[in-house]
Amino acid sequence: MVVAKKSLGQHFLTDESFLDRIVNALPPLNPLKLIEIGVGLGDLTLKLLDRYPLKTYEIDSNLCEKMRSKLKAQKKPFKLELVEKDALFLKEEEPYFLISNLPYYIATRLVLNALKDPKCRGLLVMTQKEVALKFCTKDSQNALSVLVHTIGNATLLFDVPPSAFSPPPKVFSSVFEVIKEPLKEKALASLTQVPFFEEALQKGFETLEDFLKACFSSPRKTLSNNLKKSVSYREKLDKVLDFLALESQPTSVRASEVKDYLKLLEYLLKG
């Protein structure tokens, strides 16, 4: 019997109907590799192996051993490459699509890593519902929604109740999808002077992420007040106010009311 480790945020999805819904929600992958974070009890992994070759990152050595035993007992049409490694250090050389039931405590960081990685072309993940809603809202309500929609499109697919897991978490989960868009990536990469596209895209993402942290540091305060506290951006406050005037927005706007953060950042970086 496998006991979930609280230290790793383990809640294993066991409900067959939701496992099937996740697999069926995958978009066409060819020619992308499919990468999974977390093997869990192997239920999702085994279903994926009925349709696709798969590479899975798993930090828990006990779960890796259980998965190897299951694969010896169950022959699957496609092969699994099981990597016993922390997914925070995931690095792929070829384009891939990411799928995972992400641990709650580290889900946001793993999604942001995937968004920043030029090799990741999209993702289908399950997180705490509150986190999924932050990523998928269509306006600028928070920094996560701005980041994800600057590089692609995020869609909330369905909710998963606590009863679908073992052990059951205290909150609902949600499955959402992100598909990256090359034109948006090109615009983000153009923020930097880095000559190579993939490096420029990563640098552009990091620059925007850093800027948004300053803008949303105190969401209830005005954008101006937040930037006054930022060592990196306080000297650019006058340019921010100029931009707001050009966009016919009041200087008292909150961060959630800014219409186009990429355009604003481009304006600030001009000189």
UniProtKB/Swiss-Prot annotation:
Stated EC number for the protein is 2.1.1.182
- InterPro entries noted in UniProt: KsgA/Erm, rRNA_Ade_diMease-like_C, rRNA_Ade_Mease_Trfase_CS, rRNA_Ade_methylase_Trfase_N, rRNA_adenine_dimethylase, SAM-dependent_MTases_sf
Q: Specify the domain of life of the species encoding this protein.
A: Bacteria
Reaction(s) this enzyme catalyzes, per UniProt? adenosine(1518)/adenosine(1519) in 16S rRNA + 4 S-adenosyl-L-methionine = N(6)-dimethyladenosine(1518)/N(6)-dimethyladenosine(1519) in 16S rRNA + 4 S-adenosyl-L-homocysteine + 4 H(+)
Broadest EC class assigned to this enzyme: transferase
- Cellular component, GO annotation: cytosol
SUPFAM superfamilies per the record? S-adenosyl-L-methionine-dependent methyltransferases
Single Gene Ontology MF annotation: 16S rRNA (adenine(1518)-N(6)/adenine(1519)-N(6))-dimethyltransferase activity
Q: Which HAMAP family match?
A: 16SrRNA_methyltr_A
The family annotation for this protein states: Belongs to the class I-like SAM-binding methyltransferase superfamily. rRNA adenine N(6)-methyltransferase family. RsmA subfamily.
Q: What is this protein called?
A: Ribosomal RNA small subunit methyltransferase A
Organism, by scientific name, is: Helicobacter pylori (strain P12)
Protein's gene: rsmA
